[in-house]
């Protein structure tokens, strides 16, 4: 498989995957399909935009005819599907748009892949599913939020020496595994759960070689600042309030984006079709503790006194359906393919903060205009 369609490749995770594939596989043709909504930014790929093996197509994944035409023009034999609406707060305000993009858009891609791969002889039916995997592959990236929420069961101050297979993490005994049943609680996670089911259905019904992965929260360079880490780095820099839902007790597992891109590369090339793999960072943090780490790191790098920005923390009304804890078990991926995160969380945060401080122009460009209106509408009255 050498003609790879990467959807959402101008976004946060997608741009890291596109860059990795363009640089690592010069004999591949990498086609980046992106609608360029508010979170898509071609400046994320400025360093590889002139690479001879890179192509960009501005298109909506819901436009079936356009998607099929791209399959035909580039003879696409592999898909890495990252395009999605992904912000929970936005999904609560506009669930229809999330259903359209995440469910119908995924279905459009699946149908175009089935049509073209069947016509080109790469897919020959359910009975030949294993053989089909040698000729084409559809890799769908999903989220740990489809699993619902876990409980906080550790006493305050408890510290774990190991996680997952060793029997627990810092905030609870249990983890999401690939066998955890789906219990989505937000319009966003419900839309992703539905798209996951469609991907698996195309394998079970048509023999399409599919893989699904569910990842934890990503962080790193080029993340649009509606997400917690880049939003708060920017706010700390300029002295704006840091709106914290509830009391900041919610727990998330954090994964450095370049580690995620490495996992995607490995799974795309060596993962078993019809399998699901969890990709997590084994880095559980309460939101309030993470925010204090960000404050400490930004203030130190800006030569401010320790604790200088702590007063910016502002507790706001919690959002509806706010899951308490996510923790994902990546043991299967480590056993099967040898992947594990390369960075400790503190090292990843240091790299991330330094990147945003060194790229203030990028941040200023993406936080102007319509984003400012959205930010005010979300947090000004809480």
Regions found by a protein language model. Give the residues of each.
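N-terminal Rossmann-like NAD(P)+-binding domain of SDR-like oxidoreductases, especially those catalyzing
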Residues: 1-218, 258, 268, 287, ...
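C-terminal substrate-binding subdomain of Rossmann-fold SDR/epimerase-dehydratase oxidoreductases
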Residues: 4, 30, 59-62, 108, ...
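Active-site helix-initiating loop/hinge in glycosyltransferases
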Residues: 220, 224, 253-256
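Residue-level detector of secondary-structure boundary/capping sites
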Residues: 189-190, 223, 285, 324
């Amino acid at each position: 498989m050498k003609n790879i369609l990467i959807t959402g490749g101008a976004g946060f995770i997608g741009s890291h995957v596109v860059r990795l594939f363009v640089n690592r596989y010069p004999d591949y043709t990498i086609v980046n399909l992106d609608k360029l909504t508010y979170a898509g930014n071609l400046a994320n790929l400025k360093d590889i935009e002139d690479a001879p093996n890179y192509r960009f197509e501005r298109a909506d994944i819901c436009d079936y005819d356009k998607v099929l035409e791209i399959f035909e023009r580039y003879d696409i034999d592999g898909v890495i599907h990252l395009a999605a609406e992904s912000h929970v707060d936005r999904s609560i305000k506009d669930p229809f748009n999330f259903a359209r993009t995440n469910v119908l858009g995924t279905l459009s891609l699946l149908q175009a892949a089935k049509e073209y791969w069947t016509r080109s002889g790469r897919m020959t039916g359910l009975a030949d599913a294993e053989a089909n995997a040698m000729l084409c592959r559809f890799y769908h990236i999903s989220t740990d939020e489809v699993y619902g929420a876990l409980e906080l069961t550790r006493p305050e101050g408890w510290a774990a020496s190991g996680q997952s297979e060793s029997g627990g993490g810092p905030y609870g005994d249990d983890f999401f595994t690939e066998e955890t049943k789906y219990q989505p609680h937000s319009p966003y996670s419900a839309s992703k759960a539905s798209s996951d089911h469609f991907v698996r259905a195309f394998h079970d019904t048509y023999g399409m070689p599919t893989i699904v992965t569910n990842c934890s929260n990503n962080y790193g360079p080029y993340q649009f600042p509606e997400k917690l880490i880049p939003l708060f780095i920017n706010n700390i820099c300029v002295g704006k309030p840091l709106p914290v839902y509830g009391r900041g007790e919610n727990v998330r597992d954090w994964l450095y984006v370049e580690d995620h891109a490495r996992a995607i590369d490995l799974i795309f090339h060596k993962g078993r079709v019809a399998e699901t793999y969890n990709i997590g960072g084994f880095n559980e943090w309460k939101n309030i503790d993470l925010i204090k780490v960000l404050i400490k790191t930004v203030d130190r790098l800006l030569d401010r006194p320790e604790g200088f920005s702590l007063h910016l923390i502002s507790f706001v009304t919690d959002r509806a359906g706010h899951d308490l804890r996510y923790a994902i078990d990546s043991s299967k991926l480590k056993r099967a393919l040898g992947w594990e995160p390369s960075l400790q969380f503190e090292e990843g945060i240091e790299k991330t903060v330094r990147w945003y401080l060194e790229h203030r122009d990028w941040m200023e460009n993406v936080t102007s205009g319509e984003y400012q209106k959205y930010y005010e509408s979300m947090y000004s009255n809480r």
